[in-house]
Amino acid sequence: SHMKGGPSIEYLLDLALGENEIIANKAAEVLKTQVFLYEADTDRLESAFNDGNKVARSIIESYSKAEFFTNLPEIEEEIEVVAFVAGVGDISTDLLSPGSDAHSRSDRQLHGQCLFEHNKEKQEALKALQANHPDKRVMLTAEKGTMGVGSSRMSGVNNVALWIGKKASKYVPFINIAPVVAGTNGISPIFLTTVGVTGGIGLDLKNWVKKKDPEGNTIIDQDGEPVLEEIYEVKTGDVFTINTKEKKLYKDGIQVKDVSAAFTPQKMEFMKAGGSYAVVFGKKLQ
């Protein structure tokens, strides 16, 4: 079951449609949690159903009710996160998954060593933060910038998830999902979509805004750049609470940002399912 589908389905179907009733029922319970089925798999179920197989019927009925989704635990109402500022300004995917290390992207463990362009000091600082906050999720942050600009979005998200995400399965090493990422100016659109693929959370912090004069005009500095004003502080080690029901971000019990855009009904489905692919395949299966 921890393979989430694919090649394992063939063997689960062999057991579910086999003659041993006890094993068949156990295999069926596992199949009811799976969504990544090929057409050949659903054809086998359909054929067995048409032949009057009761186990096949129970699996198909379960799929029709989307129990593979409805039986999953709900998203936590409150998620505690601790900020880790990856840098000031835009954070490129090349910082997260350098192009010079593209050859190792298929090896998650090896490629993970290149995070922050092999900056071991920064990697150790991240590990230390995690050790000091074992009960919290790390929120990788772009201060005064946008998170995830650049083209290496999938490998970048995979690498971030490897370091700060949740294990997809206790039996499958180096495959993590659901990272929490944030940026003063939000998340690059394609990077944000890819975060959704993993069931992660992307926050638009807006903790810095352009300063205005009494007439409402943007104040410009001597270099012709807008003067920024800090609305609330986000530094490494700061603890925040995401309330997924209220869709608000809190710091020290005070609301600092509305994060409704990160918790649309669709995105919350992705988070509950462990990624957008599970939702897409599940709806097709249903």
Regions found by a protein language model. Name each.
Residues 89-93, 147-157, 267-281:
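Conserved phosphate/anionic-ligand binding catalytic regions in large, soluble enzymes, centered on
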Residues 103-250, 255, 262:
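Feature captures the catalytic cores and cofactor-binding loops of soluble hydro-lyases/lyases
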Residues 57-137:
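Conserved, function-defining core regions and hallmark residues within catalytic/recognition domains
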Residues 4-16, 36-48:
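Amphipathic alpha-helical scaffolding segments comprising HEAT/armadillo-like alpha-solenoid repeats
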Residues 54-61, 65-77, 241-286:
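Intein/HINT protein-splicing elements and their conserved insertion hotspots or analogous self-processing inserts
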Residues 19-20, 52-53:
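Short inter-helical turns and helix N-cap capping residues of alpha-solenoid HEAT/ARM repeat scaffolds
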Residues 2, 29-33:
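Core register positions within helices of long alpha-helical scaffolds
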